Amino acid sequence: MPMTGLLQTTLSTADQDRSGPAATTGDTPARANTKRLHVITWGCQMNVYDSARMTDVLSPLGYTAHAEPEGADMIVLNTCHIRDKATEKVFSELGRLRLLKEARAREGQPMLLAVAGCVAQAEGEQILARAPYVDIVLGPQTYHRLGGMVRRAMNGERVIETDFPPEDKFDYLPEAAAPQHGPGLAGGRTAFLTIQEGCDKFCSFCVVPYTRGAEVSRPASSVLAEARRMVRGGAREITLLGQNVNAYHGLGEDGEVWTLARLIRALADIPDLLRIRYTTSHPRDVSDDLIAAHRDIPQLMPFLHLPVQSGSDRILAAMNRRHTAEDYFRVVDRLREARPDLALSSDFIVGHPGETDEDFEDTMRLIERVGFAQAYSFKYSPRPGTPAAERDNHVPEPVMDERLQRLQALLRTQQEAFNTACIGKTVNVLLVTPGRHPGQIGGRSPWLQAVHLDAPATLIGQEVPVTITAAHTNSLSATLPDCAPHPKELTCA
């Protein structure tokens, strides 16, 4: 399963850490022998987490985060392979970075250039062949070895490490220096925490099993220790990450294998951790105890990203999803019975090879039947090496365009209706960042909507009741009610 909610902008590690307790940016005077590191992050939330951990790995070598590529002693491009033309986008960016490297060389200041992430894993040899100025190519399972790779590169070696190592990288990564915050959210009030990596599902369209490997789960003790450090650093909401996160099966502190639900129950006991989320999930791994966790644990937010991809049983079989539309309906109904205020988001692919008009109409009917608060939708794009790419019954581009427009129009209508239904409700919002206007602050609703209101900045980091006054395409406006009590969360459905 690919992670979703893809970040469409380029993010640097310094952007993530600028307001954190251990932040170092380009505005901070460099210590003696300090080297400046700029990390460009493309793709999913796990890549954001990985970029921060690579920064931690390089810290003992004297590297600190630098806000801009200009002036950096090392640049890491952390890549994503999910969308179309991913490889060519990487080479385009590398061409830009090459100019910076050459300019630094003319000044007698060498710069290391590394390519990490899923494109590096899939195209490692090609990157070295087409971009001879790249010093290091490393896949997602070798980040714990990055320090050694840097030493080799500084001695003139061109390094490529894309094999899956026998050791588990989670056993060797250093402790996180600071919370890994969500993009654009100040103060580290929200954090990403990877607990599981890889996928064993092998959907026909997906490269993740080939770039991230088999499913691996972190020991519960490691997850809990990092979560406690994040909370001590100011995090009040933690999102648990995994390519197939609800397949989590880490070794527990009692020696038993823990499920995701059991891990969430342990996390809920951490003082001052107000909110827990997880992404991305597979419908086949929504277990009875996970449904019970949604019913029983108030810290577990009533918002779930549950990709379905298609509403056609025939296409679901072609995708190797190993569930039917009816299976998905049953899971959704059970979740909503357990947590009536639960809102859903999902992923949809239109134009998978062999998709007919009737298959597409099945998808539209599924969307109408379920109702989504938000969703991500894409045209099918063949990924080299995947079974779907080898098929010869591809859907014409104009047909995919028309289907995507119809599907997105329906999803947009549902999202607007969900947001509009919030008007007049009082909901708990975690306030996380100053707003774009003076006197304004921003936060997150339980359903992951951005919420903006006029309120003092001293409230940042708190979860407070607000009254929703207006709905916009991607956000809500709110005011602080006159009442002092902390109300129960109310559904906007």
Curated annotation (Swiss-Prot):
Record's cofactor remark: Binds 2 [4Fe-4S] clusters. One cluster is coordinated with 3 cysteines and an exchangeable S-adenosyl-L-methionine.
Enzyme kind, highest EC tier: transferase
Listed GO CC annotations: cytosol
Record-annotated TRAM domain positions: 420-482
Binding site for [4Fe-4S] cluster 1: C44, C80, C118
Source organism, top-level taxon: Bacteria
Catalysed transformations (reactions): N(6)-dimethylallyladenosine(37) in tRNA + (sulfur carrier)-SH + AH2 + 2 S-adenosyl-L-methionine = 2-methylsulfanyl-N(6)-dimethylallyladenosine(37) in tRNA + (sulfur carrier)-H + 5'-deoxyadenosine + L-methionine + A + S-adenosyl-L-homocysteine + 2 H(+)
Domain MTTase N-terminal stretches: 35-155
Compositional bias (Polar residues): 1-14
Entries under CDD domains matching the protein: Radical_SAM (cd01335)
Residue numbers spanned by region Disordered: 1-31
CC cofactor: [4Fe-4S] cluster
Domain Radical SAM core: 185-417
EC identifiers of the protein: 2.8.4.3
GO MF annotations, alphabetized: 4 iron, 4 sulfur cluster binding; metal ion binding; N6-isopentenyladenosine methylthiotransferase activity
InterPro entries: Elp3/MiaA/NifB-like_rSAM (IPR006638), Methylthiotransferase (IPR005839), Methylthiotransferase_CS (IPR020612), Methylthiotransferase_N (IPR013848), Methylthiotransferase_N_sf (IPR038135), MiaB_methiolase (IPR006463), rSAM (IPR007197), rSAM_horseshoe (IPR023404)
Keyword terms of this UniProt record: 4Fe-4S, Cytoplasm, Iron, Iron-sulfur, Metal-binding, S-adenosyl-L-methionine, Transferase, tRNA processing
Cell compartments where the protein resides: Cytoplasm
Complex formation: Monomer.
Stated family: Belongs to the methylthiotransferase family. MiaB subfamily.
HAMAP family documented for this protein: tRNA_metthiotr_MiaB
Function according to Swiss-Prot or TrEMBL: Catalyzes the methylthiolation of N6-(dimethylallyl)adenosine (i(6)A), leading to the formation of 2-methylthio-N6-(dimethylallyl)adenosine (ms(2)i(6)A) at position 37 in tRNAs that read codons beginning with uridine.
Protein name: tRNA-2-methylthio-N(6)-dimethylallyladenosine synthase
Source species: Granulibacter bethesdensis (strain ATCC BAA-1260 / CGDNIH1)
